[in-house]
Each structure stands twice: as C-alpha cells, then as structure tokens.
Swiss-Prot record:
Protein name as it appears in the record: Lysophospholipid acyltransferase 1
Catalytic activity annotation: a 1-acyl-sn-glycero-3-phosphocholine + an acyl-CoA = a 1,2-diacyl-sn-glycero-3-phosphocholine + CoA; 1-(9Z-octadecenoyl)-sn-glycero-3-phosphocholine + (9Z)-octadecenoyl-CoA = 1,2-di-(9Z-octadecenoyl)-sn-glycero-3-phosphocholine + CoA; 1-(9Z-octadecenoyl)-sn-glycero-3-phosphocholine + (9Z,12Z)-octadecadienoyl-CoA = 1-(9Z)-octadecenoyl-2-(9Z,12Z)-octadecadienoyl-sn-glycero-3-phosphocholine + CoA; (9Z,12Z,15Z)-octadecatrienoyl-CoA + 1-(9Z-octadecenoyl)-sn-glycero-3-phosphocholine = 1-(9Z-octadecaenoyl)-2-(9Z,12Z,15Z-octadecatrienoyl)-sn-glycero-3-phosphocholine + CoA
Localization in the cell: Endoplasmic reticulum membrane
Entry annotated with the keyword Lipid metabolism: yes
Active site: H356
Organs and tissues of expression: Expressed in roots, rosette leaves, petals, stigma, chalazal endosperm of developing seeds and vascular bundles of siliques.
Function in brief: Lysophospholipid acyltransferase with broad specificity. Mediates the conversion of lysophosphatidylethanolamine (1-acyl-sn-glycero-3-phosphoethanolamine or LPE) into phosphatidylethanolamine (1,2-diacyl-sn-glycero-3-phosphoethanolamine or PE) (LPEAT activity). Catalyzes the acylation of lysophosphatidylserine (1-acyl-2-hydroxy-sn-glycero-3-phospho-L-serine or LPS) into phosphatidylserine (1,2-diacyl-sn-glycero-3-phospho-L-serine or PS) (LPSAT activity).
Species assigned in the record: Arabidopsis thaliana (Mouse-ear cress)
Keyword Transmembrane helix: yes
EC annotation from Swiss-Prot or TrEMBL: 2.3.1.-, 2.3.1.23, 2.3.1.n7, 2.3.1.n6
A GO molecular function held by the record: lysophospholipid acyltransferase activity
Keywords from the named record: Acyltransferase, Endoplasmic reticulum, Lipid biosynthesis, Lipid metabolism, Membrane, Phospholipid biosynthesis, Phospholipid metabolism, Transferase, Transmembrane, Transmembrane helix
Family under the similarity heading: Belongs to the membrane-bound acyltransferase family.
Topology of the protein relative to the lipid bilayer: Multi-pass membrane protein
Length: 462
C-alpha cells in the first residue's frame, strides 16, 4: 500500500501521514539513545536524529528555520550575557510570528495540512529558557525564585550540547519542553540519573507501554468522534436553526472531540521521552519507592475533563508549556514583594496566544481563558468564605465551579478551533455570548459582594 492509499484510509493528507510516521518513530529513536555509550555520543546522536526526523517530516528547509532561533539564542549567550534572555525572547518570538504569518500555519492545520511551524514553536521556548537560565547564572542566588535556582546555568553549554538539547531525538516535534540543566544531567548521568551511589536504574518500559496504549485509545476515540462533530457545522444554516441547548451541547462535543487529538500527540511524545530515560523525575516517598515520570507528562486527561475549577486547567493541560509560561513570563512580571494580579495573568495568556499564532480565534480564546480563570477564582473565594460547618453549601459551590468551568472552557475553545473572527463570533453569538458574560459578571460582582474569610484572622498582640 502506497502513502496516498494509507493516508486516505485514515482520512489524512500524505504530509500529515509522513509526519505521524516520523513522530511515532521518535519512540524507537529515543530508545536507541539509551545504548549510546558516551556523553559526546549522546549529544551527537540526539542532534543528528532530531535533524534527520525533521528533514523526513518537513523537508530540508525546516532545519534552516530551526537554525535561526537556535543561532539567536546561542549568539546572545556568547555576546551579551546580561541581557541574553530578553534578547532571545523578543527575537525568537519575532521570528516565530513571522513564520506564523508567512505560512498561515493555522489554516494549514485546520484543513488537515502540516508544516514545521509547530516544531518551531516548541524549539522557540527551549532556546528562550536556556538563555534566561544562563542569564540567571550570573545573578545572586538570594534574589532568585526556587525555579530559577534549580535551572540556572553557571557555565555556557558547548555548541554540540546546545544542538543536542534543542533537537533531542525529535522531542521538538510536540514537546514536552524541558530544561537544559536536566538534559545535561541526563546525558552525564548526574543528579537523579546518578546510579553510582547504589541507586538502581529505573525501568521505563511499563510507563512507556502505558503511554502508547493511552495514545492508541485517544486516536481511536478521535477518529470515531471527528466525523460526527465537524467544525464546519458552526457556519452551516442547520446550526443556526437549533435551539440554545443543542447549540451549546454541540460546542461542548466539538471541544471534547478536538482534545483527543492533543491527548494522542502528547501521549506519543510522553512515551518517547520516557523510554529515553530523560522523562524520569525521581522516586516516590513510599516504603518501596517507585520511579516517577512526570517530566514527560504533558496532560492529565481526567484532570482536564473533570476539573473542579478553571484554575486547575493550566496545571493539567499542556503541562510543560504552562510550567514554562509560569516560570518565564508570569513570575518574572511580578515585582519583588508584590503579588501577581490580573495583569500578569492577562499578559501570560497574551504571550501564549501569540505563541500559537496571530489568528483572532487564538487571541479571543486566551483572553477568554484569562476571564475564565479570574471568574473561577471569584467562585472559589466565595466557597472558602462559607463556614466549614455548612458542608453542603460548600459542596454546592464546588459543583457550581465545575459546571462553570465546563461551560466557559468549551465555549472559549471554539475560537481556538475555528480561528477566524467571523466563525468565532458566529459561534459565540449563537449562544448569546454566555461564556463571556458570565465570567465578566462574576468579576464585577466580586467588587459588590467581596468574599470574607469564614474565620476572622487573629489580631496581633500590640
């Protein structure tokens, strides 16, 4: 069976099928990295295998595109360390935005196409974090946050270490994003990967098989659901004839269906990182310790679908990118001695939107996300203000927050899926902008009905 027939049998284009085959191939390629003997050999293998898979997936030009942010990051570290992080951030994002605009990648993805822009998105985050951590390496530890202390780089990585980190076995295809310091310790057998001090080497095979089985289930469910809930339905006359509840139910199912594609992709990338050994994140504290593989984890499916609060969504969806946004945007916008507020949240969501592309649907989704999280916090504060003795009322507030999250998340997700301004507004307007009005209403209401703690704070002795 040729590529065209194979692609047709599963309903994708030849380009997407080629990418999927190379993407799945990252699992055996990453496994082979385990048997590469030396530290230098691991760096060379990681860089070469990543570049080769990129060539097979997207063509020769993809590696030329990848060289641009990689060069920006390395040159900024070599030339001007005091500002290398901010230089890489703005120049790296500028190039990524240029590629988004030139290739109109969102339209290609929406129509079943593929290009290297998605991999460039992951690579951009990796080079920025590396530069920022190298910048942090020259700062005093006392003024740094815990994440900065943990990930700071005292010495500049060599060029081959840098290339291996950026392209490691195709991990730039869909993530997860990881830190340069972790990559170096993994290749050198240091830190949690040190097996010289009577530490046993964790076996990755059970966790890898679980991730592969999860990927298979996710893909099967996605292929079953996607013909039943096409995104084109939002602009069809039949959709406008439906009642409010049916329209809203369709929005929920369209968002639910789309998420399984991402669950599949992240499960494959998780399997790839786990089997290489890089996904190892330490041992549990049980009497009989078990290995943890959280470094590779990018999604908690049940955590997303059953989230009790919108605040939990960034902790369980695209986990490593959410962590990156928290460490390199959100926390760095907070001045010392002050608390983060809505500005930091909105700025972080804006960066996330720009990272995805300059489509109106992305912008509206991430602004909606900021409103959704802020509204969910209001409900939570009201819940916490209820006396513990009123357990039933507290549980009702928890359930209300769950329903609120389901409603606003799937309403907001339409913009992320359809991308265009007209289609997004048509879908939002068809349900009377309920997913926008409710969060804004909650935020405004919080000023009228502020939450008071259920127990007054004890007065300090004078």
């Amino acid at each position: 069976m040729d590529m065209s027939s194979m692609a047709g049998s599963i309903g994708v284009s030849v380009a997407v099928l080629r990418f999927l085959l190379c993407f799945v191939a990252t699992i055996p390629v990453s496994f082979a990295c385990r048997i590469v003997p030396s530290r230098l050999g691991k760096h060379l293998y990681a860089a070469a295998s990543g570049a080769f898979l990129s060539y097979l997936s997207f063509g020769f030009s993809s590696n030329l595109h990848f060289l641009v942010p990689m060069t920006i990051g390395y040159a900024s570290m070599a030339i001007y360390r005091p500002k290398c992080g901010i230089i890489t951030f703005f120049l790296g994002f500028a190039y990524l935005i240029g590629c988004h605009v030139f290739y109109m990648s969102g339209d290609a993805w929406k129509e079943g196409g593929i290009d290297s822009t998605g991999a460039l998105m992951v690579l951009t985050l990796k080079v920025i974090s590396c530069s920022m951590n190298y910048n942090d390496g020259m700062l005093k530890e006392e003024g740094l946050r815990e994440a900065q202390k943990k990930n700071r780089l005292i010495q500049m990585p060599s060029l081959i270490e840098y290339f291996g980190y950026c392209l490691c076995c195709g991990s730039h295809f869909a993530g997860p994003v990881y830190e340069m310091k972790d990559y170096l310790e993994w290749t050198e057998g240091k830190g949690i990967w040190d097996t010289t001090e009577k530490r046993k080497k964790p076996s990755p095979y059970g966790a890898t098989i679980r991730a592969i089985l999860q990927a298979a289930i996710c893909m099967a469910l996605y292929l079953y659901l996607v013909p039943q809930y096409p995104l084109t339905r939002f602009t069809e006359p039949v959709y406008q004839e439906w009642g409010f509840l049916r329209k809203f139910s369709y929005q929920y199912m369209a968002g639910f269906t789309a998420r399984w594609k991402y669950y599949f992709i992240w499960s494959i990338s998780e399997a790839s990182i786990i089997i290489s050994g890089l996904g190892f994140s330490g041992w549990t504290d049980d009497a009989s310790p078990k290995p943890k593989w959280d470094r590779a984890k990018n999604v908690d499916i049940l955590g997303v679908e059953l989230a009790k609060s919108a605040v939990q969504i960034p902790l369980v969806w695209n986990i490593q990118v959410s962590t990156w946004l928290r460490h390199y945007v959100y926390e760095r916008l907070v001045q010392n001695g002050k608390k983060a507020g809505f500005f930091q949240l909105l700025a972080t969501q804006t960066v996330s939107a720009v990272w995805h592309g300059l489509y109106p649907g992305y912008m509206m989704f991430f602004v909606q996300s900021a409103l959704m999280i802020a509204g969910s916090r209001v409900i939570y504060r009201w819940q916490q203000a209820i006396s513990p003795k009123m357990a039933m009322l507290r549980n009702i507030m928890v359930f209300i927050n769950f329903l609120y999250t389901v409603l606003v998340l799937n309403y907001s997700a339409v913009g992320f899926m359809v991308l265009s301004l007209h289609e997004t507004l048509t879908a939002y307007g068809s349900v009377y902008y309920i997913g926008t009005i409710i969060p804004v209403g909650l935020i405004l209401l919080s000023y009228v009905v502020p939450a008071k703690p259920s127990r007054p704070k004890p007065r300090k002795e004078e």
